[in-house]
């Protein structure tokens, strides 16, 4: 990886990253590590990498993306491992496709490790200021103007502004400007984006009140212990470092719901004060009570904010109700009867750009050199933001180096499903990733993210020598173990029959491979040790992946067949300037949709709502005609 000098403000940057949340930090680190002169612009340098909402990273589909970021050489997994205080594997009793890692994070520790690495990174400069407008020259983005009157020039500008664009905070019927509680919003940038030609909408998200830990009676709650041993996110890091803490579980009740309903007339959501659309899959507690009146209780996870933090986060009750209603509501929940609120829950409205206005690289269609990543694209969640930040950074780098873009398929990464959904379908509400959004999710397991993406990260210059060596060693061990399992055969002699008897399994009538034995539903890889003690020599992660590949070989083969069947459409590129109005057989509605989305491939065109098989045939015929010309 090349190293260049740290530039001064008047110099030309390769890329300016505006916003230092999860998308911005991931993007800035990746660009700088790949040798590009990068400026990270933030309104508050003390809160770089701040966890604005819940103190947790990972979860269903989200943990998968953290692993993918790590496999490509990104940072979130390493940072989470260093600051994690409770690691749990979700869906551990279910199939490998939906098992996911989630970690409670020490909020202050995470901030420290992110800031440490950002400020120590060569090629990366931090500047505290607010971007006010995009500089446009020669039909492309050329830099930003700031509130301090500075002009910073760059070949590319990447906006990762989170909830800060015209952000407005609501607590009851009181509201005021803010990017999050305690930080000013970005007030000028939205007008600049509209002038460029981007259409902006309005979204809403919310967070819970924070509670004083010493005022909580944990004895009235169910204890949720961490996994022992903890399973880290990073394939390449030193593992989990901090002591592990429990979380606690309690529930709302009818008294809670009565207190909430009593505040409906002062709710900014129910009185129409909030205009932005909220997250369908992370509703406020007042929304849950209103929409599900038949539910007698809702779960609340009381999560530690850190090893030394005096605060706890009651996950499950985000709210924008007035403070007095929040107090009354909290006081009805078992264990929280005497809990003191340190910070109120609140909702925040902010501007976003419908991502259908982006290319698959996350560059805007309206202006070359301008890129968007994170919540500005209508997503919710730290992991979705970080994945987009890395995606955009890799594509900025590819553009700077005149390389083909980084565009993995939906069968290769959850982050590819995320981006494809965004740029193909757009979104009118905060988008959250789920495993159900991926049609090839058995291929997209947490434990094979490195196998799927590390080679790509190496080719792009983000995977360093140490990471590559560790991956290569693991890959060689996996191939060796799989080879042994397929080729080492067991003859059903007396000794073998005795082993099968002790395992409670019928002995085979003829010679079988170890892989054949492992495919039995009740057996796991350690059960094979009496047949071949060499199985114990392999690391746990190698054995886990080998067991998955063997046990699910039939399902995996069928998924690969489906991928191969659709490969032709995914590999058929549509010209960006294709004139859909002249193609015979396309309806006006389909012409409008194709013209708006400008799909990169025939496969992407097929995923646009309303584009029919007949329309795809028309596109194929037109491509053949163009090829003949």
Curated annotation (Swiss-Prot):
NAD(+) binds at residues 278-292. One of its GO terms (molecular function) is flavin adenine dinucleotide binding. Keywords: Cytoplasm, FAD, Flavoprotein, NAD, tRNA processing. GO terms for cellular component: cytosol. One of its GO terms (biological process) is tRNA wobble uridine modification. Its cofactor is FAD. Homodimer. Heterotetramer of two MnmE and two MnmG subunits. This is tRNA uridine 5-carboxymethylaminomethyl modification enzyme MnmG.
